[in-house]
């Protein structure tokens, strides 16, 4: 099931980071909003630790005007700890080897850029995250690759694995998502996000009915949700409107119309996750 990821040139990943540095910074800023950290002030309380001067003044004004004052005039400081784990799951099927129209880049190269940008952004914040990938050759042969695990640093070895990723075979999403969920659910963090990056719908060599694999993927999304894992699909398929909402839900996917702009769209994806 799980296979060793081959290695490439880590310097290529550093080149991606240099090329898209402003975008990586923007992604980091948005991810940071997912779980605020540090001391935050909660206002509008009836049993807080100290008086909120502004609220007290408003209450006095209401009394003088003969109106019923708002009695929630206290506040307290609360420590907010980050409580988030993220898995980026990459579709590495054969179709990712195809060139993007009017470009020298393949879908796989754009997928790699997405993984690298998310990785550097989350690394900067300090949240535990993993980058895994998958392809399939029938229901009994799922190829699952772990490029980076939660307890690993985003270091030279991880970068080499990301550069060494290859595309091949088919796309049995449901099984791969369940396995990704298995690793994600082992993390102690309360909030868990699974970001699937794909260029098409579920497919495999031993299944001729696409509806069956769509249903299986939808079931995987539902099962993960019941266990506390939020799934979001970033799809590069321009025709995904036909099926993606039924699988992932109305507000749990984003279609990238121009795949060359995938790195620029990632901040929008994480912004949607915060809503």
Residue ranges and their predicted role:
Residues 1-85:
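Acidic/polar low-complexity segments with low predicted structural confidence
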Residues 76-107, 197-203:
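MIDAS-like acidic motif and immediate structural context at the N-terminus
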Residues 82-85, 89, 94-98, 125-165:
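Metal-dependent catalytic core segments for phosphate chemistry
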Residues 96-129, 180, 214:
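…and closely analogous acidic/polar surface helices at protein-protein or active-site interfaces
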Residues 139-192, 234-242:
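Von Willebrand factor
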